[in-house]
């Protein structure tokens, strides 16, 4: 089996693949004190992978301080090659990005999976939206060229910024209200954050699409993709775990 790891800002998400089939997904949300402790990751991964035979692993990370700890923890559990995704590896598209050394590898994985699954065979441009802690937009031109995209705040960051930057606005649970007209401070915040996120994604998708020569395929993924797919008024594909699928794809493509 192939193990795909996505070391994110809030948690480490993992997927086990048999061929191209995703057979199991799990996540680990470490306490801050343990996030860079290799022995913690060794214990967590040893438990999670007790019944799995891992023959190859791939990893993307947006938290450099955790990358080495997770990798060392994994190497203490499985005797398998580990491919760490990087912009200089073999990719399913050409990079047209001014600063590839700063390109998040989670973005690269999402774009690779989105292009391969939804755009390449049809020679159709693709826009991937990964809605998590941040909202990442990836643009792949129909010629197979990654053009870049955009990065914005996700729902949790918006809520935290409003709470931290104001004197009286409370912390609120992130539930989408039925109407955008908030009749209380709580529902007004929920509306501004979540309906605002939905409209932001819809507006950005349209702006990015206008830069392309064809009608691109819009693909949604990430932890906040469910309310988006339910409420956008434009057509989109829903592709859960797209980053993990991209990690698998790139690890296989670059397997020694």
UniProtKB/Swiss-Prot annotation:
<dbReference type="InterPro" id="IPR043129">
    <property type="entry name" value="ATPase_NBD"/>
</dbReference>
<keyword id="KW-0418">Kinase</keyword>
<feature type="binding site">
    <location>
        <begin position="104"/>
        <end position="107"/>
    </location>
    <ligand>
        <name>substrate</name>
    </ligand>
</feature>
<dbReference type="GO" id="GO:0015937">
    <property type="term" value="P:coenzyme A biosynthetic process"/>
</dbReference>
<feature type="binding site">
    <location>
        <begin position="6"/>
        <end position="13"/>
    </location>
    <ligand>
        <name>ATP</name>
    </ligand>
</feature>
<feature type="active site" description="Proton acceptor">
    <location>
        <position position="106"/>
    </location>
</feature>
<dbReference type="GO" id="GO:0005524">
    <property type="term" value="F:ATP binding"/>
</dbReference>
<feature type="binding site">
    <location>
        <position position="185"/>
    </location>
    <ligand>
        <name>substrate</name>
    </ligand>
</feature>
<keyword id="KW-0808">Transferase</keyword>
<comment type="similarity">
    <text>Belongs to the type III pantothenate kinase family.</text>
</comment>
<comment type="function">
    <text>Catalyzes the phosphorylation of pantothenate (Pan), the first step in CoA biosynthesis.</text>
</comment>
<dbReference type="GO" id="GO:0046872">
    <property type="term" value="F:metal ion binding"/>
</dbReference>
<keyword id="KW-0173">Coenzyme A biosynthesis</keyword>
<dbReference type="Pfam" id="PF03309">
    <property type="entry name" value="Pan_kinase"/>
</dbReference>
<keyword id="KW-0963">Cytoplasm</keyword>
<keyword id="KW-0547">Nucleotide-binding</keyword>
<feature type="binding site">
    <location>
        <position position="133"/>
    </location>
    <ligand>
        <name>ATP</name>
    </ligand>
</feature>
<dbReference type="InterPro" id="IPR004619">
    <property type="entry name" value="Type_III_PanK"/>
</dbReference>
<feature type="binding site">
    <location>
        <position position="97"/>
    </location>
    <ligand>
        <name>substrate</name>
    </ligand>
</feature>
<feature type="binding site">
    <location>
        <position position="130"/>
    </location>
    <ligand>
        <name>K(+)</name>
    </ligand>
</feature>
<keyword id="KW-0630">Potassium</keyword>
<comment type="subunit">
    <text>Homodimer.</text>
</comment>
<protein>
    <recommendedName>
        <fullName>Type III pantothenate kinase</fullName>
        <ecNumber>2.7.1.33</ecNumber>
    </recommendedName>
</protein>
<comment type="pathway">
    <text>Cofactor biosynthesis; coenzyme A biosynthesis; CoA from (R)-pantothenate: step 1/5.</text>
</comment>
<keyword id="KW-0479">Metal-binding</keyword>
<keyword id="KW-0067">ATP-binding</keyword>
<dbReference type="GO" id="GO:0005737">
    <property type="term" value="C:cytoplasm"/>
</dbReference>
<dbReference type="GO" id="GO:0004594">
    <property type="term" value="F:pantothenate kinase activity"/>
</dbReference>
């Amino acid at each position: 089996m192939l193990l795909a790891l996505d070391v994110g800002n809030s948690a480490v998400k993992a997927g086990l693949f048999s061929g191209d089939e995703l057979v199991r997904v799990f996540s680990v949300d470490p306490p801050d004190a343990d996030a860079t402790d290799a022995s913690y990751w060794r214990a967590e991964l040893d438990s999670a992978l007790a019944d799995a035979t891992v023959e190859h692993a791939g990893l993307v990370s947006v938290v450099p301080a955790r990358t080495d700890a997770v990798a060392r923890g994994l190497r203490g559990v499985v005797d398998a090659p580990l491919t760490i995704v990087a912009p200089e590896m073999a990719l399913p598209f050409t990079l047209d990005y001014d600063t590839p050394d700063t390109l998040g590898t989670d973005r690269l994985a999402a774009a690779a999976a989105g292009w391969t699954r939804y755009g390449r065979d049809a020679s159709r441009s693709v826009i991937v939206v990964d809605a998590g802690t941040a909202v990442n937009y990836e643009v792949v031109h129909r010629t197979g060229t990654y053009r870049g995209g955009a990065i914005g705040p996700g729902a949790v960051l918006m809520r935290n910024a409003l709470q931290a930057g104001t004197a009286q606005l409370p912390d609120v649970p992130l539930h989408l209200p039925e109407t955008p007209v908030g009749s209380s401070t709580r529902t007004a915040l929920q509306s501004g954050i979540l309906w605002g996120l939905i409209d932001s994604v819809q507006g950005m998708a349209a702006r990015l699409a206008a830069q392309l020569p064809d009608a691109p395929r819009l693909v949604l993924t990430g932890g906040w993709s469910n309310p988006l797919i339910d409420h956008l008024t434009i057509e989109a594909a829903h592709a859960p775990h797209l980053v993990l699928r991209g990690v698998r794809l790139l690890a296989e493509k670059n397997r020694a």
